[in-house]
């Protein structure tokens, strides 16, 4: 059994003037440890996004990567400094799914398309007889792997912001495709 640990992070920048967004961009990243040794990193960025979407996308990308690299019985731990993301997949999504992907107050779920895509990947991981765990880590602290993911996400965000284009950096070029295509 191989142990995969992904440290994920997302970042976004928005410039507002007179209450209107003039320009925005975001970045995401993951750092992968296999059996507690750094194995690889992956990051990307795109215009017109939010911080929460990028946090979720980092999780999506890490799960896609895990499904490509893992074998039956492997273990994966997703480490994120986003309480929003951790709570979605450890507390809220189970009830949302039971209620037809609706919140108990009837309000729409933000980022639902991406959440459902991650939910589908979670099912694929389980069907592969792999164990999946989510872990909340403290952001901007002494955790070198979370700090590295934060730095990579910030760099990708800045490049996407300056260029206005989708960018991708990683060992598996084409793994994730264009932002507009990343979720079915």
What are these regions (language model features)?
Residues 73-84, 162-176:
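Charge-dense, low-complexity polyampholytic segments
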Residues 75-76, 95, 151, 158, ...:
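Flexible domain-boundary/linker segments
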Residues 11-18, 63-148, 180-183:
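RNase H catalytic domain
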Residues 1-53, 57, 64-67, 150-151, ...:
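RNase H-like nuclease fold core
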Residues 35, 126-127, 169-170:
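Charged, low-complexity intrinsically disordered terminal regions and linker tails
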Residues 33-36, 59-60, 104-108, 115-116, ...:
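Short, surface-exposed, polar/charged, turn-prone segments marking secondary-structure boundaries
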Residues 99, 106, 155-158, 170-174:
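Short, surface-exposed, charged/polar-biased interaction segments
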């Amino acid at each position: 059994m191989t142990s995969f640990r992904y440290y994920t992070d997302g970042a976004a920048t928005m410039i507002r003037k007179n209450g209107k967004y003039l320009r925005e961009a975001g970045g995401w990243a993951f750092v992968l440890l296999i059996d507690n040794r750094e194995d690889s990193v992956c990051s990307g960025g795109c215009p017109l996004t939010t911080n929460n979407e990028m946090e979720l996308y980092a999780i999506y990308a890490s799960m896609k990567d895990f499904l490509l690299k893992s074998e039956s019985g492997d273990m994966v731990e997703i480490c994120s400094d986003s309480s929003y993301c951790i709570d979605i997949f450890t507390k809220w999504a189970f009830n949302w799914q039971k209620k037809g992907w609706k919140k108990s107050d009837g309000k729409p779920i933000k980022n639902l398309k991406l959440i459902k895509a991650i939910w589908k990947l979670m099912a694929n991981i389980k069907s592969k007889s792999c164990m999946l765990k989510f872990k909340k880590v403290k952001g901007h602290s002494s955790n070198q792997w979370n700090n590295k993911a934060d730095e990579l996400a910030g760099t990708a965000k800045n490049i996407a912001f300056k260029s206005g284009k989708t960018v991708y950096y990683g060992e598996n070029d084409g793994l994730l495709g264009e932002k507009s295509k990343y979720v079915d």
